[in-house]
Amino acid sequence: MEKAQIRISVRGLVEFILRSGDIDNRHVQSPENAMLEGGRIHRMIQNSMGSYYHAEVSLRYQMETERYALSIEGRADGIEDRFFGMSSMEVPPGEISGEKRSAKNGSGRKKTKATSLSERLDTWTVAKTTTQMTTQSFIEQPVLVDEIKGTYRDLKKIKEPMLLHEAQAKCYAYIYALQNGLDNIRIRVTYCNLDTEEKKLFEKDFFFEELEDWFLEVLAQYRKWADYTCEWNEKRTESIRQLAFPYPYREGQKELVTYVYQTIYHQRKLFIEAPTGVGKTLSTVFPSVKAVGEHKADKIFYLTAKTITRTVAEETFALLRGRGLLFKTVTLTAKEKICFCEEVECNPEACPYARGHFDRINDAMYDFITHEDSFDRERVEHYARKHQVCPFEMCLDMSLFADAVICDYNYAFDPHVYLRRFFADASGQNYLFLIDEAHNLVDRGREMYSA
């Protein structure tokens, strides 16, 4: 039997496993503007580099277990390597035991290594320009992996890279070193002010063994989440296989179920118009769930314009769970409605749930997903209070482990608030959208995109 595939991006991995500290939105800029400017800054910096600099390099690491294959993938902002492309870009499967894999010289380049750890550069070097060499800690200049970050912060106040930015660069550096048989490699975190275009660069050298120890430790922390995902997906798929339509079909209902399933199977679009009370919600949710069980879709997004229709969707999934379905659903509630505080001030000084949120959230989530299948507002509030975390942020995070997300149109279509964790890049996931009362999208769309 073919192994299950579990995929996560490099950024998703480090942001999930290594996050810590407080929620603090006091210094956050408008995300849509920052994203547009960030893309421009990336291209500007990448285009200014020399011929040995290669932008947007796709990298992939795969670890095989007895039950599933775990893939960590992403694109390095830049790699500076004069031997680029001379060795295979495919990572050999690793063993789940975590045994170190010896790097093999794949390009004929000279392999060199400092004689002791005291010879390496133990602190960050702040490079003045993109072409300046840092203090030599190895016999020859190593390959460099560049992580570019746009920011509105005063660069003079940045004394060292943020942990998560450094971690992304280290992941890409490890995968690239493993693929290309490198004993050492350099990472660089490049900060560029989005207003002034001023740059500040931090560089650091690593032995391959150092990166491997660090990377395998990160994977070890993610292991329980991957194990859980695999086990849950197996149980979910088996329950879907045995699931039958809960009632005798009404007139025309079986045909509707068939149309919906065929639409999903052939990856088409279907517009449905039918009177109230004919069972449209059940007739669309049931075949959608079946499609997930047959791997025709990875996740269902049930999009609505009204709270009452979100309740109908929750009741429909609850009905199917009552018939034996194992299927996790999350209902996203607006921050203003679910916040525990009188005023929505998301910073550690104003909100005790924001203070230390990221130190506690992963334990809270694991407690939640291993004890509940419905992540509705009432249950979210219960677990958020139990673990003293922000209920709104917890709700968003639980969507990562939900089989269906019930939410307002905004979370899919509004450029200001859409779920970037799912829709910001081409993740390769196959999402299924059930849009209730789609005629409302016209007016809502005008509101979302109005200047």
Residue ranges: model-predicted function:
Residues 232-273:
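Conserved pre-motif I regulatory segment
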Residues 284, 387-404, 409-451:
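Signature of the SF2 helicase/ATPase Hel1-core->accessory helical subdomain module
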Residues 262, 281-296, 316-319:
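Walker A/P-loop NTP-binding motif
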